[in-house]
From Swiss-Prot:
One GO cellular component, as annotated: chloroplast
Keywords: Chloroplast, mRNA processing, Plastid, RNA-binding, tRNA processing
Protein's job: Usually encoded in the trnK tRNA gene intron. Probably assists in splicing its own and other chloroplast group II introns.
Name this polypeptide is given: Maturase K
The keyword Plastid appears for this protein: yes
Organism listed in the record: Drimys granadensis
Domain of life: Eukaryota
GO biological process, one term: mRNA processing
Gene responsible for this protein: matK
Amino acid sequence: MEELQGYLEIDGSRQQCFLYPLFFQEYIYALAHDHGLNGSILYKPMEIFGYDNKFSSLIGKRLITRMHQQNHLILSVKDSKQNLFVVPNKYFDSQMMSEVFAVIVEIPFSLRLVSSLEEKKIAKSHIRSIQSIHSIFLFFEDKFSHLNHVSDILIPHPIHLEILVQTLRCWIQDAPSLHLLRFFLYESRNSNSLIIPKKSISFFSKRNQRFFLFLYNSHIYGCESIFVFLRKQSSHLRSTSSRTLLERTHLYGKIEHFLVVLRNDFQRTLWLFKDPFMHYVRYQGKAIMASKGTHFLMKKWKYHLVNLWQCHFYLWSQPDSIHINQLYNHSFYFLGYLSRVQLNPSVVRSQMLENLFIIDTAINKFETIVPMIPLIRSLAKAKFCNVSGHPISKPARADSSDSDIIDRFGRICRNLFHYHSGSLKKQSLYRIKYILRLSCARTLARKHKSKVRAFLKRLGSGFFQEFLTEEEQVLSLIFPRTYSTSHRSHSERIWYLDIIRINDLANHE
């Protein structure tokens, strides 16, 4: 990593204009291999990326040798049968090159992230808590109880692969690297259709997920840049009227001149976005935008977003991609939770001398619950139960031991409880535990060709201990046996700051 940082610091312009020579450096392939095993450069676990263990430094050396032997490294994507390297295993070379390409283009952004964290004096140990999915719900609890309207947004996909290339041209001005990017995109298009997929997650190729995650995030960054632009313009205009920041006289003078020229068009449009209570949250291809403003303001946001996406970013937005609802009467689904703002009435008694006052108040409270029907559908899709929620047995491998099978089912149960620990009503989660526990018992009974009841009797209470959740284990140690720990675990809401990806079974998008 020190060699790479030294290379990038030779000249600031080289960080973006000369990425292609890095493909011929052996330490880049070693870096890609290490990140594949330990996590990406942005501190994310590699189970997200579906990493291939065959990707070794020895194979990287052989690939570099073959690249040096080639005379034509500029690709032609017109012929789908043409490949970069005339070798027997061309698919694996293409896969490895796309992984290396993703690592190379991540590096300048990662160095920028590290420098930004150092400027803001944020420790690297706090990165995981900042990236935690549960931290989003803490933000919801703090902000959404005071808002009025919420918009569910499905971010559109590019209508053509060349749009992704044009997006990266702002950062990568190296022509050979852009040709490589086109090659990888069109190769993936020939094997997997990436244009207007049915679901956002299907946008990523299962084979080169690191590469497509980077491209997708770059694409989303372009769509979200309009929020930053409008926020900055709105802030500048307010400062222009107040004349408080004298060191920006020239900047505000230009903006004032700009307003004189386009006062009738631009200023009339911009006032619609002067909403200090607008909040925006995104995960993958879905976003939530909430505001304290009126329904008319939210409709204006929808109108301008759709037009900007289609006219400026060339993104086709479906008519039903943005839904506007009143926050008090609507439950929105996000990150595996069903969230809503509930009015909780309360009675306050106050006595002054001989007079007794009773005041009825209503407090807005942000609530999160587990959607049972989508979760049971996910379990049915994974063959743990049928669509009605009745547990079924899964086919077990002959070489799998009983302890491995029990550990696998118990780990799935604990992970689900861990992810949904922020739910106010956990009673529904115990039905999920029942499904997984009985599915495990039926799987073991099927393996040993015996009845479920007899097999459970033989296993004893140790079998049920494997399905104890983390909260239940802690509460059982803190409180005595006579205390009802189940009541506490049902009512307590816990947010964990170590969860940086959505649970696979909870992702029903």
